[in-house]
């Protein structure tokens, strides 16, 4: 049976993610105490219900991170496929969302300010984030978050999932990257008026960057680095690794390099591609 645990920071979109799981055909339970998870799984099996499970867990249920990791290991040992989805957002974004909704943080009744509550929650949940697939919703609306969840669900993962993500530095760096590479020193098609309207997915940009020795050297170096270290991370039982490729605007060089790396890594690892700033390009 496939079981998805959804966790993350309050205000980051866990409820939206859970609703998308329900729309995708999962049997969903919100705010389940972790000690009840084995009983829920057993009940589901006894009913011969083949519907996949999605369970939201957070600080309201008094989540014990050590217990959570033990539960995951135990369920996997029984042959269940257990995935963890973690949603988060930047602190300033969470503060704004709480202000707009006028809702209190779940920890706010413990004599802490909102900022202190957010910091405590982030520290508390960090060990769970380490084994999860992370979605940063800072610059997402509900529809975009739903799309990100759907794209993640499409990946039939049997081993390490490698997320190749392009981003523009001027929009902020992704906070969930395991490796980050800066492409701003490479030749930039943006300064060619004929290439500026295109993205790194288009043939004119590919032809231009294919002919740049420095660009090809960079792709080779990143491929060597990634393929050297990924097996070691896999040995540590990591489920997800995010490789972030950044440049100034996020439209040309890095999109090309992410796509180039994906072609080279395809067949060796499960891949998920994200282009954060190239809005016309779908994650896949």
Swiss-Prot record:
The keyword GTP-binding applies. Gene3D superfamilies: P-loop containing nucleotide triphosphate hydrolases (3.40.50.300). ATP binds at residues 8-15. GTP binds at residues 58-61. The keyword GTP-binding applies. Transmembrane segments: none annotated. Keywords: ATP-binding, GTP-binding, Nucleotide-binding. GO terms for molecular function: ATP binding; GTP binding. It holds the Pfam family PapZ_C. HAMAP family: RapZ_like. Displays ATPase and GTPase activities. NCBIfam families: PRK05416.1. Belongs to the RapZ-like family. This is Nucleotide-binding protein NMA0948.
């Amino acid at each position: 049976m496939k079981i998805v645990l959804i966790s993350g920071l309050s205000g980051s979109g866990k409820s939206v993610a859970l609703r998308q799981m329900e729309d995708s055909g999962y049997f969903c339970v919100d705010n389940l105490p972790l000690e009840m998870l084995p009983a829920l799984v057993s009940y589901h099996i006894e009913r011969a219900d083949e519907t996949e499970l999605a369970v939201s867990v957070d600080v309201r249920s008094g989540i014990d991170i050590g217990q959570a990791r033990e539960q995951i290991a135990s369920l996997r040992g029984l042959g269940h496929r257990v995935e963890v989805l973690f949603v988060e957002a930047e602190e300033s974004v969470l503060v704004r969302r709480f202000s707009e909704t006028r809702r209190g943080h779940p920890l706010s009744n413990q004599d802490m300010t909102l900022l202190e509550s957010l910091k405590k929650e982030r520290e508390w949940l960090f060990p769970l984030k380490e084994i999860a697939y992370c979605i940063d919703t800072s610059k997402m609306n509900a529809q975009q978050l739903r799309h990100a969840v759907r794209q993640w669900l499409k990946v039939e993962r049997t081993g390490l999932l490698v997320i190749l993500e392009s981003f523009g530095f001027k929009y902020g760096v992704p906070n969930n990257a395991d490796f980050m590479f800066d492409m701003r020193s490479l030749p930039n098609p943006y300064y060619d008026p004929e290439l500026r309207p295109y993205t790194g997915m288009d043939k004119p940009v590919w032809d231009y960057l294919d002919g740049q020795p420095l660009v090809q050297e960079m792709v080779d170096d990143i491929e060597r680095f990634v393929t050297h270290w990924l097996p070691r991370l896999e040995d540590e039982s990591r489920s997800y690794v995010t490789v972030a490729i950044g440049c100034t605007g996020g439209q040309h060089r890095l999109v090309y390099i992410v796509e180039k790396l994906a072609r080279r890594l395809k067949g060796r690892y499960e891949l998920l591609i994200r282009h954060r700033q190239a809005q016309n390009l779908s994650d896949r």
